[in-house]
Each structure stands twice: as structure tokens, then as C-alpha cells.
Amino acid sequence: MKRQYAVIGNPIGHSQSPYIHRLFAGQCQQKLEYTAKLVAMNEFRAVADAFFQEGGHGLNVTVPFKQDAFQYAEETTERATAAQAVNTLIRQDNGLITGDNTDGTGLVTDLLGNLNWELKAKRILVMGAGGAVRGILQDLLDQQPQHIVIANRTVEKALQLSRQFAGSGYILGCSLDMLDG
């Protein structure tokens, strides 16, 4: 029997996740079905409930539902709790839905391993203050940059994130208008 997985978001048509996961499953001789699901803005909980009730095993969560997924999870990993955002929901053997956030691990692994970028003592600019940014900040701060600036259209969101992660390093929030060429 194939395990059921999906990526959910809005929009979702651009996602390459189904293609990538099917290729990976084939390489690992795993039997799985991986689909993309467009979810209406107020339907996250209903869609996630139906997916898991119908035997679904795991969901990848993208824009704009990462904070909804954090609220949905019955238990969360340390990094998901720090981010207060979830991009991965998995039904455990005991039935509990666990939320994790792998955004930061993926980004830092790519920057260090594939691009050979050193982040320690560097100045980092992050554009935006949504769920993906929540997921990357702790992993970036763990690399001990000189500082991180979060720039966002809505300055209050950037400031809120800078306060949330202030205990982990030097982090500032500002509006996009405050950036100087």
C-alpha cells in the first residue's frame, strides 16, 4: 500500500514538490503518493483533518499556512516551537500529529554545503517576515552572524520577529523603506 503525502498551500500550482518527492521515492524504492492541494484561505484545518482521517501520513505546508500548521500540530519539535511555524506535519504511529520546521536546516545546509558561504561574523539581510522567515532565523543565528536585519513592508512584523529571536543573537527589524541602496 502506498503512503499518502501532499503539499498544501495557496497558491500551489507552481510547486515542484510532487515531482521531486516522486523522483526521490523512486530512487529509494519507496511506495508513496505525493500530491499538491490548493487550500482556500479559511480551510486549512478542514483540509488537514480530512487528509489525516483518510489515512494520510504527512503534509508539507507552504504559504500562507505555516502558522496555522503550528497551531494544528498536537506536538512540535524544538525548532518548530522556536519558529512558531511548521512546514512539515506527520502522523506518528501513535496517531499524534507532529509539527516540524525544516526551512532553516535546508537553507543553512545549502548555503554552507553547496555554496560554501561562511555565515559566522557576516551581516545578513532577510527580506520578509512570514512563516518561512520564522523558520530560518534560529538556524541563521546558530551560525553566529555579526547581525541579522529583517526588512519587511509591515515594519511591526519585522520588529515582532526581531523581539522574538533577540535572545539568540543580534537581530534588527525595519521597513523596506529604511534600506539604503
For the regions a protein language model found, what residue spans apply to each?
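A general structural motif
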Residues: 2, 56, 121-122, 145-147, ...
